[in-house]
Amino acid sequence: MRCLTTPMLLRALAQAARAGPPGGRSLHSSAVAATYKYVNMQDPEMDMKSVTDRAARTLLWTELFRGLGMTLSYLFREPATINYPFEKGPLSPRFRGEHALRRYPSGEERCIACKLCEAICPAQAITIEAEPRADGSRRTTRYDIDMTKCIYCGFCQEACPVDAIVEGPNFEFSTETHEELLYNKEKLLNNGDKWEAEIAANIQADYLYR
């Protein structure tokens, strides 16, 4: 197979453009030339301005100082972040944070030991034990949540018929040991007592959509 040099290839393309495809519109050589890129063509000669710009970028680090100038300009602009933990952003009423067990205003715990939350939990993080009381009602004797298993899906809160188990607004509950993340009933009730005002406000704000 004979290799065509660049001049020969250009002449062949020009002849094909003048002849045109059968029954079709003829192609202009300029359009053909613009369509193809010839890898063996030499780069066009650079003028003095291009040489000067390239030398300035290489020797004077103009791009570096341009980037530093942009960085320094942000020192005089309004910050886009907040000064956490001294400042905190707003949370959605549907925010799913640390778990809590709620009480009625009388002080009676809401949980009726139906175990729907335990059954629906996809991570199997909830363990409940219950026994009947003298009045025939059921109350939990054990309510444990392994917070290291929890995926914060909110299914337990959605399944609860009495709004007993909720995921409250608190997200700052980091610990130093694994045992501190094994919540029992007392810990969950204490969380509910601590965050009841915020939890009730969030439920009230979201009740139309539940």
Curated annotation (Swiss-Prot):
A Pfam cross-reference name: Fer4_7
GO cellular component, one term: mitochondrial inner membrane
GO biological process: aerobic respiration; mitochondrial electron transport, NADH to ubiquinone; mitochondrial respiratory chain complex I assembly; proton motive force-driven mitochondrial ATP synthesis
Domain 4Fe-4S ferredoxin-type: 102-131, 141-170
Effect on the protein upon substituting residue 159 to D: In MC1DN2; uncertain significance; decrease in enzyme activity; impaired assembly of complex I
Protein residues bound to [4Fe-4S] cluster 1: 111, 114, 117, 121
Chloroplast keyword on record: no
Gene Ontology MF terms in the entry: 4 iron, 4 sulfur cluster binding; metal ion binding; NADH dehydrogenase (ubiquinone) activity
Cofactor(s) needed for function: [4Fe-4S] cluster
Membrane topology: Peripheral membrane protein
Protein residues bound to [4Fe-4S] cluster 2: 150, 153, 156, 160
Transit peptide: 1-34
Tissue specificity annotation: Expressed in all tissues with the highest level in heart and skeletal muscle and the lowest level in lung.
Cofactor note: Binds 2 [4Fe-4S] cluster.
E.C. designation(s): 7.1.1.2
InterPro entries noted in UniProt: 4Fe4S_Fe-S-bd, 4Fe4S_Fe_S_CS, NADH_quinone_OxRdtase_chainI
Reactions catalysed according to its record: a ubiquinone + NADH + 5 H(+)(in) = a ubiquinol + NAD(+) + 4 H(+)(out)
UniProt keywords, alphabetically: 4Fe-4S, Disease variant, Electron transport, Iron, Iron-sulfur, Membrane, Metal-binding, Mitochondrion, Mitochondrion inner membrane, NAD, Oxidoreductase, Primary mitochondrial disease, Repeat, Respiratory chain, Transit peptide, Translocase, Transport, Ubiquinone
Keyword Metal-binding: yes
Similarity annotation: Belongs to the complex I 23 kDa subunit family.
Function according to Swiss-Prot or TrEMBL: Core subunit of the mitochondrial membrane respiratory chain NADH dehydrogenase (Complex I) which catalyzes electron transfer from NADH through the respiratory chain, using ubiquinone as an electron acceptor. Essential for the catalytic activity and assembly of complex I.
Disease tied to this entry: Mitochondrial complex I deficiency, nuclear type 2: A form of mitochondrial complex I deficiency, the most common biochemical signature of mitochondrial disorders, a group of highly heterogeneous conditions characterized by defective oxidative phosphorylation, which collectively affects 1 in 5-10000 live births. Clinical disorders have variable severity, ranging from lethal neonatal disease to adult-onset neurodegenerative disorders.
Subunit note: Core subunit of respiratory chain NADH dehydrogenase (Complex I) which is composed of 45 different subunits. This is a component of the iron-sulfur (IP) fragment of the enzyme. Interacts with RAB5IF.
Protein name: NADH dehydrogenase [ubiquinone] iron-sulfur protein 8, mitochondrial
Organism: Homo sapiens
Gene: NDUFS8
